[in-house]
């Protein structure tokens, strides 16, 4: 590249000096001088999704939108991210606009509910003001808004049932995101907006599905995750979980349109062992011969459920396989065996009490 004229360089330096004097250090910089541009991430608690996102999780200092049909696992994924943030010593805020947060389920996923900051706002304006105040404090690592559809504007709540409020929620979201975007970036906080799907009337071609709250969130979000339940997981006659597929429909920090598939088990969340088996087979680290799964000389079991059970009972083998997968994708390695989930601990405690 040709060198810039020395007089131009001096003029730029003077202008940058004046800007920094007026607006503070770091308000303007040369991209090459900024060492902070390496994007940090917080894991989603799902190995396949971390790989699909390209940076090992959801990016810090960015807005993330998780959307999909009802009961597809949107809140579960958000709570897993909250649990991972808390494991790293981070603080998490949860704006429960739907008034539907289940603390015992959150505990089962590994969330420290004692230190989870929860707000159940009366209006959309109140919820977004609380979110902004928490982000502005600089002490919050993850803020979750569940959900955009439940952020009802004050005028709609105070009005009559049949009143028309066209575009009111879209304007509210647009204004809130304009205020939030800069603060989120400066404080390195992750803002996760959970959103619902609606159908556009009279669409002949293309998908009729759209998300609530206007277009602003689509523009401001660095990552958008489309969550779908694709199958039920059966054990005997009962259904014990869902098979879930996530498509990364927008990604500003890595290549988009990658997909992840995993199990969400009822009362347990994302199955870490199932994920390790699936990704291990895909990466040819775990060998599948007929119905048998094996890792090197170790036979994991006949059938996927038995292989999952073996990894649950032998966490050091699961850790070894996971770290090999992480190494292959340049993701940070796990340095210790994952602690037992709250559900497993509760199960053991109940068993001990019944034995007594």
Swiss-Prot record:
Q: Which GO terms describe its molecular function?
A: ATP binding; ATP hydrolysis activity; ATP-dependent DNA damage sensor activity; damaged DNA binding; single-stranded DNA binding
Q: Where in the cell is it found?
A: Cytoplasm
Q: Give the intrachain disulfide bonds.
A: none
Q: Which GO terms describe its cellular component?
A: cytosol
The answer on whether this UniProt entry bears the keyword rRNA-binding reads no
Q: Which domain of life is it from?
A: Bacteria
Residues involved in ATP binding = 68-75
The UniProt keywords, alphabetically, are:
ATP-binding, Cytoplasm, DNA damage, DNA recombination, DNA repair, DNA-binding, Nucleotide-binding, SOS response
Gene Ontology BP, a term: SOS response
Q: For this UniProt entry, what is the primary localization, expressed as one broad class?
A: cytoplasm
What does this gene product do?
Can catalyze the hydrolysis of ATP in the presence of single-stranded DNA, the ATP-dependent uptake of single-stranded DNA by duplex DNA, and the ATP-dependent hybridization of homologous single-stranded DNAs. It interacts with LexA causing its activation and leading to its autocatalytic cleavage.
PANTHER family attached to this UniProt entry: MITOCHONDRIAL DNA REPAIR PROTEIN RECA HOMOLOG-RELATED (PTHR45900:SF1), RECA (PTHR45900)
Similarity-based family: Belongs to the RecA family.
Which NCBIfam families does the entry mention?
Answer: tigrfam_recA
Q: What is this protein called?
A: Protein RecA
Per the UniProt record, the source organism is Clostridium botulinum (strain Eklund 17B / Type B)
